[in-house]
Amino acid sequence: MNLINYTKRYFESKILIFLFLAIYLLFGIFIFKDYGISFDENINRFNGFVSLKYVFEKLGVNIDLSLFVNNLPNLSDYADRAYGVVFDLPMAALEVILNLTDPQEVYLFKHLVNFLVFFLSSICFYFLLNHLFKNNIISLIGLLFLISSPRIFAESFYNPKDIILMSSFIFAIFFNIKFLQEKSNKYIILGSLFSALTTDIRVIGIYLPVLTLFFLFFDGDNKGIKTKFIKSFKYLISFAIFFILFWPWMWDGNIYKLIISFKEFKNYPWEGEVLYFGNFLKAKFLPWHYFFVWFFITTPIIFFLIIILGLFRSFSIFIQNLINIEKINHNNLWKNKNEMILIFILFIFLIPVASIIIFNSTLYSGWRQLYFLYPPLIILGLY
């Protein structure tokens, strides 16, 4: 009887999740036409066509792109060549394939695809939460945190950079955690693939594979150092292949271009001003607390409180382990596999925030450049 009841509850919970996701998908498809064009969309579209022109030239494809966009420069001469086009390039190709020449059709199509990418990442986020917590209710709550945040929900339709980055980051976190736990070739490929895609969208994403390999080596399991070197080598080779493959600007193998992209991200050369606490401030001279304030005022208060409590608890566990490191097996920073993943997620959040504060990176339009940190914050809040 217990087995029957368990099986019944299991299928009921799966049906509930399926219905919830189906309703969410239909709702998004129903309202995607209600959103206008955001500031960056036209720029990103142009970026995609510049790279598409370069790809066509390399492949010997003769298609007149002036039917879609005029005055396309060569990629080598383009001012924004250092920005990844993982999303923009396929979207430009789809415009050509579908022969979308009407501007309204173009941007409505982009909004629909933008939402669908976020929807797929939402499904992945649910599976990630269920993998970590083994609880359908907690996983559903975490999913609600993600998709019902007003700013995230709205921008999931018209933000082709930050939302796409966050979506790719969710997949990358999931598969890198699976790689750390199982260390199989399948997850080497999937983890390196989505890490490369994330890095190709914004170069800051490169810290995730570095962090993953750091945790691989410092995990005091029964795997020998030779095995870990082999796994790391496979991961790095796969990452390098995917990284170059999905970023046409990198096809010539010039590693210096990666440094150029880093410099662009570290201090984006935008001379605009930002209204902050009643004063107009240069975006490149914003105070260190800019991100934290914007996160607070744009996140539902109950979400914010849960995330802060989880962040405090996670940081406390890490500090306690650091103090008592000599008492832990193999001198690890974690006592068990669950704590390893918790501290891994904590560092996923801490590293980019610390980098932005230290390098005084240019921020504007709220905290959208750091949206990719929202999913790991939700995970920390639920722990």
What positions do the PLM features span?
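Short acidic/glycine- and proline-prone juxtamembrane loop motifs at membrane-interface regions
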Residues: 38, 151, 157-164
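Short helix- or helix-capping micro-motifs
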Residues: 142-147, 174, 195, 199
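Transmembrane-lumen/periplasm boundary regions of multi-pass, lipid-linked membrane glycan transferases
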Residues: 52-57, 80-89, 98-102, 197-199, ...
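Transmembrane-helix signature of polytopic, membrane-embedded enzymes
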Residues: 18, 123-148, 181, 185-186, ...
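Transmembrane-helix motifs of polytopic, lipid-linked glycan transferases
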Residues: 108, 112-133, 171-175, 316-319, ...
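Specific aromatic-rich, kink-prone transmembrane helix
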Residues: 124-127, 164-181, 190-195, 349, ...
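Transmembrane signal-anchor helices characteristic of membrane glycosylation enzymes that use polyprenol
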Residues: 13-41, 49-59, 63, 67-74, ...
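Transmembrane-helix signature of polytopic, lipid-linked glycan biosynthesis machinery
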Residues: 28-33, 152-153, 157, 197-199, ...
